[in-house]
A protein has these predicted regions:
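Extended, charge-rich low-complexity interaction segments
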Residues: 192-205, 331-348
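Adenine-nucleotide phosphate-binding core of ATP-dependent small-molecule kinases
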Residues: 236-285, 292
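Small-residue (GG/TT-enriched) beta-loop-alpha framework at ligand/catalytic clefts
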Residues: 11-19, 23-36, 79, 134-236
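Conserved phosphate-binding/catalytic loops in two-lobed NTP-binding clefts
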Residues: 300-339
Length: 348
């Protein structure tokens, strides 16, 4: 089982806060990807937090039902792990032959992960020579608490499935969203239900990985309280009208003003941190995904606040889909970044 490296024939599973996404692709990076099978099933947000036997059984039934609905036959599965359950960082070690670098990281891992290595599952990939210092090599290091990883493994394999990879969600989502071959750096943002994942890519590799507390649910709570409306109405207002100041008399925008200011400040801090670390390298664009990929006018707001060109990304950019598939996916397409990225692992 691997946290980071490539695998063979499989399907991908992303267990979100309020839905599960499942996808199987054919093809590869060089020739392109083709969507073969997929499923999207809404779930109660309380279910993913329910660790009781009943809760586990119910979630398992939903996963198996989604697999059957999608027509997926393989039992091999790659599973995403939420950023809050993992630790991912870019570290630097003295440059040396790859075998020596591997040994250095392996024997000194306890210096880099925020938990005892005896209690953690640690994996890493050598990114190459640091763009900032040719005497250093950069390493993508990822770790997860053993208890959580083993619990997830047991729950999935109890369904008769074979877990061949577990991967931090931020690493998965950039595989689907990052532009290829650009000369500058790009920040990829996935606004989820309860948190926001942020990755800065440079030279086709992650160089900064972090998670920002707060997601769509925090936006909804603010609008619900400010406008004195029901939760479902607040959610609808945000997703339908977004930050348009000519809709609902700009009440949604005004209600979210302080929350958005703090959100944009976190993005600006990340841009500055990256540009201070990599002297002379600019973050040339921000790509939005998840709910930030569909909230009207949020891209314009972020661009105004950060001074960085911002677009709403398309996680399907490298995947061929039929018109019928596209029609079925339309309402939820932006939520598939992690699942697609997981499914695009095979030729990594």
């Amino acid at each position: 089982m691997s946290l980071l490296h490539g695998v063979g024939d499989f399907f991908a599973l992303d267990i979100g806060t309020n839905s599960i996404r499942m996808i199987q692709l054919s093809g590869n990076v060089e020739k392109g990807w083709v969507l073969e099978k997929f499923a999207y099933v809404p779930i109660d947000s309380k279910l993913t937090q329910d660790d009781s036997e009943t809760g586990r059984r119910r979630l398992g039934e939903i996963i198996l039902g989604a697999r059957q609905q999608a027509g997926i036959r393989t039992k091999n599965i790659a599973v995403g792990m939420p950023a809050r359950k993992t630790y991912t960082a870019i570290i630097e070690v003295p440059n040396a032959p790859k075998r020596e670098i591997v040994n250095t990281v392996k024997y000194e891992a306890d210096q880099y992960v925020p938990m005892s290595v005896d209690d953690a599952k640690v994996d890493f990939a050598v990114l190459g020579i640091s763009p900032n210092d040719t005497k250093k090599a950069e390493i993508l290091l990822s770790s997860v608490d053993n208890a959580y990883a083993e619990s997830l493994l047991e729950r999935i394999e109890a369904l008769g499935l074979n877990v061949i990879a577990q991967e931090p969600e931020p690493i998965s989502m950039v595989r689907a969203l990052a532009p290829v071959g650009v000369q500058d750096a790009r920040m990829i943002i996935d606004l989820g239900e309860t948190s926001t994942d942020l990755v800065v890519m440079y030279q086709d590799s992650p160089r900064l990985v972090r998670s920002i507390p707060g997601g769509l649910a925090s936006f909804v709570k603010v609008v619900e309280s400010s406008l004195k409306v029901r939760e479902d109405q607040a959610r609808q207002f945000i997703l339908k009208f977004g930050l348009a100041q000519d809709k609902l008399e700009g009440k949604v925008y005004n209600a979210l003003s302080s929350t958005l200011e703090n959100f944009a400040l976190e993005l600006t801090k990340s841009v500055r941190f990256f540009q201070n670390r990599y002297a002379g390298v600019q973050v040339g664009g921000i790509v939005l995904s998840g709910f930030s990929g569909i909230i009207p006018f949020i891209a314009e707001y972020i661009e105004m606040k950060t001074g960085v060109a911002t677009i709403q990304g398309n996680p399907w950019q490298y995947v061929k889909v039929t018109p019928q598939q596209q029609q079925l996916l339309l309402p939820v397409a932006s939520e598939f970044a992690v699942a697609i990225g997981l499914a695009e692992r095979s030729n990594d």
